[in-house]
């Protein structure tokens, strides 16, 4: 397929000297030549072209055209060539844009390793993909997935500490901003995609089984270099818990007797949310490669759920259903607001050594129709991406010391506020091995006081005394396409203890204070 951007619209094949044997059509003053049939809509081709007829040659326009066409998954490759209109007048150029069609359908099988905050596992999936559903390079994906994970930190109550997941999901991705009233000029200025998705997942944990059904409509776009935006315009999730283990149910019943807020995190719930995410990375995506120069990244995420449904229930004069609050089809809906801030700075000392600083803060506040956050929206501390002197989900909230028998602590050790601080020195050792020395600090807290999470509530005059501190060493395998990270952390300050036990750094004990972690990426 060739498009020539000029006023005369006379197009020649650069290889054969003519377009004999090609069909053609004209769209908005542009002639398009093709064989058999057009595999992309003419409007899409015009919208994704940045070269304008009658304007001065611009290398930037050429590169922007390559970049725009590169986002069309239906294309195998694109090539732009320029040729003088005639020998006597070298000031005018004809632009030839040659597009090669790629494979529009594919089936793939994937096997992957998983790492959920330090819990290791494996997953397998089979997917079907169609890259040109409506002749606009729309990508339809259907995937069936199964996963297994070994869970840590459950205590001794469970003989089976395995987690299994089965699910099916589908999505339809559009290579442009699909929203009414937006002009073509605006769409050309940003690199955007729109996606609608459906998903069903069945999860079986040792303590409960859970089913999740979701539907979403989201946008991703970039209007400047290094900046990414994501808008979840509508994200509807229904969480259904068909069964709970006897021990877990007994524990929840006990919570009910104590009027615990935690029990509300493990009930059926409808989550209708909107969210926005802003990401800036001065060095591009460095998650899977070692940075080579000083850089920094910033991520801000905000989301809300339930406000429109709560307002509609009020306007309709609905009656709350006891502790469930307002319901839709007898299903309570969650209402909360949540915000996350993440900043990381990498200082390159020299090509072999660097110093990294990171801070992460998260706050979520349930209100209105919710007494507590849904389980999947709560914060946890400890693990490979948090305070590495503690195993995953074993720290906090606040100064919570855990139950006397150590049972079910993984339920209680969650919160509404999270703080993570990290400083790390990195050095190249040899070959593909890098070493690191780190100091971590942080914890989680609850917003409301709960009898089951004693000393876990956030207080301004107390929280800084409850910040846990850890130190340790790590090894990184830089395999170019990914980084394997192994860390060993030791507790330095333990807010769960009092007296001399609060400062294990003064009397370190390996069996008590050490935690090992494996992760992918920095």
Task: Locate predicted features.
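Acidic/histidine-rich, surface-exposed loop or edge segments in extracytoplasmic proteins
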Residues: 43-51, 256-257
């Amino acid at each position: 397929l060739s498009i020539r951007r000029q006023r005369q619209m006379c197009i020649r094949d650069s290889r054969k000297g003519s377009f004999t044997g090609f069909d053609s059509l004209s769209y908005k003053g542009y002639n398009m030549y093709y064989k058999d049939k057009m595999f992309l809509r003419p409007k899409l081709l015009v919208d994704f072209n940045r070269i304008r007829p009658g304007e001065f040659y611009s290398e930037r326009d050429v590169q922007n055209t390559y970049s725009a066409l590169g986002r069309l998954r239906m294309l195998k490759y694109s090539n732009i060539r320029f040729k003088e209109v005639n020998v006597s007048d070298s000031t005018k150029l004809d632009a030839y844009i040659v597009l090669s069609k790629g494979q529009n359908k594919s089936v793939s099988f994937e096997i992957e390793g998983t790492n959920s905050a330090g819990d290791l596992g494996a997953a397998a999936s089979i997917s079907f993909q169609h890259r040109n559903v409506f002749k606009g390079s729309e990508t339809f994906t259907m995937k069936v997935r199964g996963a297994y994970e070994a869970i840590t930190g459950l205590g001794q109550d469970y003989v089976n500490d395995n987690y299994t997941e089965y699910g099916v999901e589908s999505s339809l991705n559009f290579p442009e901003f699909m929203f009414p009233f937006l002009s073509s000029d605006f769409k050309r200025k940003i690199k955007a995609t729109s996606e609608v998705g459906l998903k069903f997942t069945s999860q079986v944990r040792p303590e409960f089984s859970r089913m999740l059904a979701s539907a979403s409509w989201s946008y991703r776009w970039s209007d400047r270099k290094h900046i990414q935006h994501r808008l979840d315009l509508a994200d509807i999730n229904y969480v259904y818990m068909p069964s709970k283990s006897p021990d877990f149910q007994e524990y929840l019943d006990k919570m009910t007797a104590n009027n615990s807020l935690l029990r509300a995190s493990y009930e059926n719930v409808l989550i209708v949310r909107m969210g926005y995410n802003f990401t800036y990375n001065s060095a591009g995506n460095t998650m899977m490669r070692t940075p080579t120069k000083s850089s920094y990244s910033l991520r801000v995420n905000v989301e809300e759920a339930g406000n429109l449904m709560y307002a509609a229930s009020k306007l309709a004069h609905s009656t709350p259903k006891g502790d469930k609050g307002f319901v839709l089809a007898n299903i309570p809906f969650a209402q909360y607001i949540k915000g996350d801030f993440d900043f990381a700075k990498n200082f390159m000392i020299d090509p072999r050594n660097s110093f990294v600083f990171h801070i992460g803060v998260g706050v979520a506040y349930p209100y209105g129709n919710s007494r507590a956050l849904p389980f999947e929206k709560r914060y946890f501390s400890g693990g490979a991406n948090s305070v590495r002197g503690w195993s995953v989900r074993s720290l906090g909230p606040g100064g919570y010391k855990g139950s006397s028998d150590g049972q079910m602590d993984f339920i209680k050790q969650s919160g509404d506020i999270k703080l993570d601080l990290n400083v790390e020195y990195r050095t190249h050792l040899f070959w593909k091995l890098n070493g690191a020395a780190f100091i971590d600090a942080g914890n989680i807290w609850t917003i409301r006081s709960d009898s089951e999470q004693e000393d876990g509530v956030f207080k301004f005059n107390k929280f800084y005394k409850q910040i846990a501190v850890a130190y340790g060493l790590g090894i990184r395998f830089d395999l170019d396409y990914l980084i394997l990270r192994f860390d060993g952390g030791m507790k330095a300050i333990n807010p769960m203890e009092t007296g001399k036990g609060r400062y294990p750094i003064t009397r370190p004990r390996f069996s008590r204070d050490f935690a090992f972690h494996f992760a992918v990426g920095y």
